[in-house]
């Protein structure tokens, strides 16, 4: 009999949780992230059985491996999935587009907010609704409620809001760094009028500050218990789970020649918080045929440095002596590498110093490099113990040397490339100039991925098929796109006419509601005020603005 899937914290403890409890809890009380007790096996005939399935049908097949029917009956799970993806504009949900010989882009931005976060957050929103409705069924008092608190560098916030707006028994607070999201991203969040939505601009902050506030609130046992906090950031396992699906979907959309036995396939993923690419790693471990996953970072390059050196460093101890050759590759002329603080770049969703989901991979790396002695439970305990040591050192010193054995273990599945701002703009121009596969306007994060793909292809077999994840519609990042394509060689380019969808144009002039606060105490005070007001709308700053 197959072992029923449960979930445990990366940082220790013998307790395991059901899928429902792991989703509703989000972050473990000890600060760890929930991961499955085992990675399940695919059906032997999955390549033929799943070929031709729609995205919702494929989602059901994959998610069923991680969600027991005792937690969500099969028909209910399919209904949740169908509702989650009913608002996507593409029949394929996440279609691929050919951009070169053996090169494809996986467009993940056909959901309601035009960003890849919709894939996971539409699903997570439906999960929250389903679990709370079931728990509150037949109750007339003491109804269970969820206070969702999340941080965003732009796209997570709007996707979470659209996934949770007007859902009963849920109040959502989205924190973002004041002045450091694009006008369209802020408009998508702040123009939603639903009474359960609160957009919180944290003054004098960056994304890491906002994310740190969220983690602190979740780690505060009393505050968490009082308000029943729920997580929508990629620390929530359900988000990783939903994202696994589009790696399989992309595979099945490839020409048959690219899917034959022995064919080489690589995915390239613009990477900030490590959730998107971690989903690809789980897909690989499940059995999806691929060589490596390419981590594409911008100038906030802590991940690229880890895969190159084995050191995970967030402080100013890292000063690299670049030769002329490495400077040319890394684009040092576009600014010093990020070490002591987050650098604002043209790809802001990747402007992250510490990647929260990297902890999940570190657990598996600890497990792999600890040796094979002991029972499964003993090996798990040793891995958790080692991970705790790493995280304690990182918290204390701002850096941790994970060792050459860990770096080599990671290198079996990952390769990393760092892309500068200047190279990002050049890539946007390059794809707009393309003739064979037509002009293609890409957002700056996709441009980072495409640059990394081109570099990686020079080191790989020429018959490799490449899929680069496109994480946002270019309209979401007008500043970088217009900067790249405003040159004299593109006199006919008009951003509003050529790129901006009508749905986003309609945001112009709509009333915005924003709550501006200072630091953690300001966030706490706002949540306390809202929850004590019995869900009456707490006044926000109101205003209108152009995009």
Swiss-Prot record:
Keywords: Amino-acid biosynthesis, Lyase, Pyridoxal phosphate, Threonine biosynthesis
GO terms assigned for molecular function: pyridoxal phosphate binding; threonine synthase activity
InterPro entries named among the record's database cross-references: Ser/Thr_deHydtase_PyrdxlP-BS, Thr_synth_N, Thr_synth_N_sf, Thr_synthase-like, Threonine_Synthase, TrpB-like_PALP, TrpB-like_PALP_sf
Sites bearing N6-(pyridoxal phosphate)lysine, chain numbering: 117
Cofactor(s) essential for the protein: pyridoxal 5'-phosphate
Any one of the GO BP annotations: threonine biosynthetic process
Pathway: Amino-acid biosynthesis; L-threonine biosynthesis; L-threonine from L-aspartate: step 5/5
Reactions mediated catalytically: O-phospho-L-homoserine + H2O = L-threonine + phosphate
PROSITE patterns named among the record's database cross-references: DEHYDRATASE_SER_THR (PS00165)
Residues noted as binding pyridoxal 5'-phosphate in the record, renumbered to the chain: 272-274, 276, 471
Enzyme class: lyase
EC number: 4.2.3.1
Biological role: Catalyzes the gamma-elimination of phosphate from L-phosphohomoserine and the beta-addition of water to produce L-threonine.
Similarity remark: Belongs to the threonine synthase family.
Listed name of the protein: Threonine synthase
This protein's encoding gene: THR4
């Amino acid at each position: 009999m197959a072992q029923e899937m449960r979930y445990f914290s990366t940082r220790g403890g013998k307790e395991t949780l059901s899928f429902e409890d792991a989703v509703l809890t989000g972050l473990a009380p000890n600060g760890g992230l929930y991961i499955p007790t085992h990675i399940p096996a695919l059906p032997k005939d999955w390549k033929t059985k799943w070929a031709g399935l729609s995205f919702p049908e494929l989602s059901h097949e994959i998610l069923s491996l991680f969600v027991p029917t005792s937690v969500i009956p099969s028909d209910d799970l399919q209904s949740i999935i169908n509702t989650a993806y009913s608002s996507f504009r593409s029949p394929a949900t996440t279609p691929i587009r050919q951009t070169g010989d053996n090169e494809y882009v996986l467009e993940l931005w056909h959901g309601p907010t035009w960003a890849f976060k919709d894939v996971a957050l539409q699903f997570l929103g439906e999960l929250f609704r389903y679990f709370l409705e079931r728990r509150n069924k037949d109750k007339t008092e003491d109804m269970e409620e969820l206070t969702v608190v999340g941080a965003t560098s732009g796209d997570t916030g709007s996707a979470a809001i659209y996934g949770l707006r007007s859902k009963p028994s849920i109040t959502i607070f989205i924190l973002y760094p004041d002045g450091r999201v694009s006008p369209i991203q802020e408009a998508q969040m702040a123009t939603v009028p639903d009474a359960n939505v609160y957009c919180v601009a944290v003054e004098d902050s960056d994304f890491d500050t906002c994310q740190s506030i969220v983690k602190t609130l979740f780690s505060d046992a009393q505050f968490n218990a009082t308000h029943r906090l729920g997580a929508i950031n990629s620390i929530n396992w359900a988000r990783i789970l939903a994202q696994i699906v589009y790696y399989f979907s992309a595979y099945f959309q490839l020409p048959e020649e690219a899917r034959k036995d022995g064919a080489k396939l690589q995915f390239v993923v613009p990477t900030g918080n490590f959730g998107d690419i971690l989903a690809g790693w789980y897909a690989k471990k499940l059995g999806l045929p691929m060589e490596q996953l390419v981590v594409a970072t911008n100038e906030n390059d802590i991940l690229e440095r880890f895969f190159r050196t084995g050191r995970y460093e967030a402080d100013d101890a890292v000063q690299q002596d670049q030769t002329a050759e490495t400077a040319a590759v890394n684009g040092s002329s576009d600014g010093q590498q990020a070490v002591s603080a987050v650098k604002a770049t043209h790809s802001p969703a990747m402007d992250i110093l510490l990647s929260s989901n990297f902890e999940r991979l570190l657990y598996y790396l600890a497990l792999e490099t600890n040796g094979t002695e002991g029972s499964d439970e003993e090996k798990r305990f040793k891995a958790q113990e080692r991970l705790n040591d790493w995280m304690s050192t990182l918290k204390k010193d701002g850096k941790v040397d994970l060792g050459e054995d860990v770096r080599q273990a990671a290198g079996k599945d990952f390769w990393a490339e760092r892309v500068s701002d200047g190279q990002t703009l050049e890539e946007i121009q390059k794809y707009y100039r393309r003739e064979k596969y037509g002009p293609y306007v890409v957002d700056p994060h996709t441009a980072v991925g495409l640059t990394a793909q081109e570099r990686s292809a020079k080191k790989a077999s020429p018959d490799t098929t490449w899929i680069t994840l496109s994480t946002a519609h270019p309209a979401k990042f007008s500043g970088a796109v217009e900067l790249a394509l405003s040159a004299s060689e593109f006199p006919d380019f008009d951003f509003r006419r050529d790129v901006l969808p009508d749905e986003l144009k309609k945001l112009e002039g709509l009333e915005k509601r924003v709550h501006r606060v200072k630091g953690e105490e300001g966030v706490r005070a706002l949540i306390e005020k809202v929850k004590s007001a019995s869900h009456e709308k707490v006044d926000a700053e109101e205003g209108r603005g152009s995009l």
